[in-house]
Amino acid sequence: MEPVDPNLEPWKHPGSQPRTACNNCYCKKCCFHCYACFTRKGLGISYGRKKRRQRRRAPQDSQTHQASLSKQPASQSRGDPTGPTESKKKVERETETDPFD
C-alpha cells in the first residue's frame, strides 16, 4: 500500500476513482470498469427507480373470449364421482359381511 496523504479527503485518494468516467457501454471492459459498473452492468443490479412497463392491450375481440369462457363446462370436483353416501354404504356392507373373531 502506498502512503496516503492524511490531508486528502477519502474520495480523493489515489485509486479510489477510475481515471475515466462511467458510461453506458456494456462491453466486457466497461463492465469491469469499477465496482459500480460491475454491479450495474455485469450483475444487472440497480437500486434506482424501476421503469414503468406498459401493459399489453387486450385485443378487440376480448368480449367474445369472455363469452367462450362462460360456455365451458364446470370442472368436476376431485374424488369419488359416485358421491360420499354410496361409498359409506359400501363400507357398511363390507363391515357387516366380515365375521368378527
Swiss-Prot record:
A motif (Nuclear localization signal, RNA-binding (TAR), and protein transduction) lies at residues 49-57. It comes from Human immunodeficiency virus type 1 group M subtype B (isolate ARV2/SF2). Asymmetrical arginine methylation by host PRMT6 seems to diminish the transactivation capacity of Tat and affects the interaction with host CCNT1. Acetylation by EP300, CREBBP, GCN5L2/GCN5 and PCAF regulates the transactivation activity of Tat. EP300-mediated acetylation of Lys-50 promotes dissociation of Tat from the TAR RNA through the competitive binding to PCAF's bromodomain. In addition, the non-acetylated Tat's N-terminus can also interact with PCAF. PCAF-mediated acetylation of Lys-28 enhances Tat's binding to CCNT1. Lys-50 is deacetylated by SIRT1. This is Protein Tat. Residues 48-101 are annotated as: Disordered. It holds the Pfam family Tat. One of its GO terms (cellular component) is extracellular region. Zn(2+) 2 binds at residues 25, 27, 30. Zn(2+) 1 binds at residues 22, 33-34, 37. There is a cross-link at residue 71 (Glycyl lysine isopeptide (Lys-Gly) (interchain with G-Cter in ubiquitin)). Residues 1-24 are annotated as: Interaction with human CREBBP. The modification N6-acetyllysine is found at residues 28, 50-51. Its main location: host cell.
